[in-house]
């Protein structure tokens, strides 16, 4: 049965207004809301119904501090690997581990090798399934008015050891969840000119892999600056982000203009 138009619009609104948040207020998250978010995550699709996700809620301040130290170490290592973009990267805020109301670590469960259905030729489908759970939680958080950020800057083995995970388990995400003063009008990395959203035409092929129409002759995509300029021209016709957050979003594709 088709959803009502208002329900459909709400789904698309959550998708297009979801943001990878890095700025949080210290306000606590209502335990009932957190429970709803985790339940939404647990109802994600998974290949072979393997349900590979495991969530560790971090409530120990010392553990939170230790996790932040791991993230900071990897942030510096990533900067060193970025060459000429090192300084630009270091100016970005890439996590909210210390500020967010709730901190969760998502891991792939141990014993995943026994799940053969759907993984015999694509063993990475356990990761894809867990990513679906994270996306479910992300959209639910946005609908609840909470921000969420996925942090992947950490040494996998170090975080596994810190949280006493069994052999075979693998941490894949540090999730910062909490209240925010405002949601970004556009993805933060787009706002900061780090990158820009590719046109859908560059990602959509028909009956085989084609060179996207927007791809240059040398095989490269437009530079972040060029793509961002185009996105800014589009954004000039958008409604104000604050007004968008309180208005009814249509279901004819226009919600994409908010993103």
Residue locations for each model-derived region?
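Extreme N-terminal tail/first-helix region
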Residues: 1-14, 90
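Glycine-rich phosphate/pyrophosphate-binding beta-alpha loops
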Residues: 43-48
